Amino acid sequence: HRTGPKRAVASGTITPKAMLVAALVTLGVACAVGCTLICYGGWILLPAGVIIALFALAYSAGPYPLSCHGLGDLTVFVFFGLIAVDLTYFIQAGTVETMVWLGSAGVGLLSVNILLVNNYRDMENDAKANKVTTVVMFGRQWADLSNLVNGIAAVWLASYDKPAIALSLIP
């Protein structure tokens, strides 16, 4: 029995074809909006945008969906953390400083924690459906520890050059 939100395609509410069309339209709109950022960040953003779009599709579609083969956490870390934060900063500043890279890693770790909580909840159903998440591979105890370590690491990364922030880690 599923405790999370209803899965539209799996439940038959939406056909796979309709979901694909909706996903491609949404991705197309996102790409069109993203192309306007080339005016601010330069043409280097075009190949970055293509890579982002390809990984958006590869995350849950195609012959080898990353989210079903234990690569969801890494993908979320890279694209919701490093790329999202660093490209945003680059577009505005024209460069990316070390502290931005560290901060983006922290954001990526916190994003992975959100995915871990979701996969923790869905562990049994994912295992039955052969969706191999890191929680399915390594278990709930590993997920608990990962959530803790990711949270502490995110605070440490944010406080790298501001040691007083690390005081928040003291219980």
Q: Residue spans of the language-model regions?
A:
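Multi-pass membrane catalytic core of lipid/isoprenoid biosynthesis enzymes
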Residues: R2-W43, K131-A164
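Small-residue-rich segments of transmembrane alpha-helices in multi-pass membrane proteins
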Residues: L74-Y89, V107, V135-A143, I152
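Intramembrane alpha-helical segments
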Residues: R7-T98
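Alpha-helical transmembrane segments
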Residues: W101-V112, K162-S168
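Acidic (Asp/Glu-rich) catalytic motifs at the cytosolic membrane interface
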Residues: H1-T3, N113-V135
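Terminal transmembrane helical module of multi-pass membrane proteins
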Residues: T98-V100, V107, L116, Y120
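Conserved small/polar residues in nucleotide/adenosyl-binding loops
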Residues: P171
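Alpha-helical transmembrane segments of multipass membrane proteins
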Residues: A30-V33, A84, L110-I114, A154
